[in-house]
Structure formats: C-alpha cells, structure tokens
Regions:
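Class I S-adenosyl-L-methionine-dependent methyltransferase catalytic core
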Residues: 1-169
Length: 169
C-alpha cells in the first residue's frame, strides 16, 4: 500500500506508555493502518473505550477482523467528538503530520493528551506552515521523545521521526 509504513511494536509500546491511558478513557487511533498502535492499546489498556479511523478499504477489513471499533474512514470529517487520548502515526509527506496533529489537538477533551509520531520536517523547514506549527507548539504543554535513526527501517522507510506528546489543559 503506497505511503503506508506500519508503526513498529517497540514504538507503539512507547507511545502507549507516554499516553497514560486509564480504564474508561475515550481513546482514538485516527490513522489506524493495520492496527499496530490500536493492538498495543487494546492489549495494555483493556478498559479503554478505543475507536479507530482508517481510509484504506483493505486495512479497514483487517481492523474489523481484528475486532477494532472502526468509527470512520476520514480523519478530518469526524466532528463534534472529543477524546481523552489520541495516539497516532499520521502520514508525513507534504507536512500532513502537522495537519493531523493540529486536528487531533482540537478534538481532545480538556485534560486530554495527544501522542503522535511526526517527521523531522516540521521542526526545521523554513516555510510558513512549518514555522507556524513551531510557534503553535511553543504555546502548548508538550514533550518530545527522539527516535533513533532507522526506527522505521523494518517498515520500509529510513525517514527520521520523533514522538510528540501534547497535553490540552
């Protein structure tokens, strides 16, 4: 599947640890892919109310077979809902990760937490979109977990990435 790079289990486990998910929390994985992150959430946080979104029909079928609660196929069309935790590995190409992070943050409940893999581009590019994102991020309560070079090599890409953890107060 073009542009699909599943989250390695070790990274998904770190993301779920960073998310601090408790029983009863509403949790969303909005770029669910094959369910790499959602599988870890379900395994480590069985009391969470977990929902997933995925646009690819083949991957939707896989998520359904795995028993995940598929609530939509378009990340940006799910309005009027808020989640306590959003854990995601969105596409990086053309700064799509910036769009996904901003949308996800807007759909967090007060006191919620977003944990997202992001590419390096938003943190060093000089174009307006990247600069605006950095300025926005500086106004948030956030932390960064750097990932080793080659962290996604097993998934077929050498892109450097990091985990960004943002709390909504």
């Amino acid at each position: 599947i073009p542009g699909f790079f599943p989250t390695p289990t070790s990274i998904a486990e770190e993301m779920v640890r960073q998310a601090g998910i408790s029983t009863g929390m509403r949790v969303l994985e909005p770029s669910a892919g094959s369910g790499s992150i959602a599988d870890v959430i379900r395994e480590q946080c069985p009391g969470a109310d977990l929902s997933v979104i995925e646009y690819n029909l083949t991957l939707q079928d896989l998520l359904k077979v795995k028993g995940h609660n598929l609530v939509g196929d378009d990340f940006f069309s799910v309005d009027g809902q808020q989640w306590d935790r959003i854990v995601q590995n969105p596409p990086f190409e053309n700064l799509q990760d910036v769009d996904h992070v901003r949308w996800a943050f807007d759909h967090l409940a007060d006191g919620g937490r977003l944990v997202s893999v992001m590419g390096e581009s938003p943190f060093f590019r000089s174009d307006a979109k990247a600069a605006e994102f950095r300025a926005w991020l500086d106004d948030q309560v956030y932390d960064v977990v750097d990932l080793e070079a080659g962290a996604f090599a097993a998934s077929g890409t050498g892109v450097k990435a990091r985990i960004v953890v943002i709390d909504k107060e």
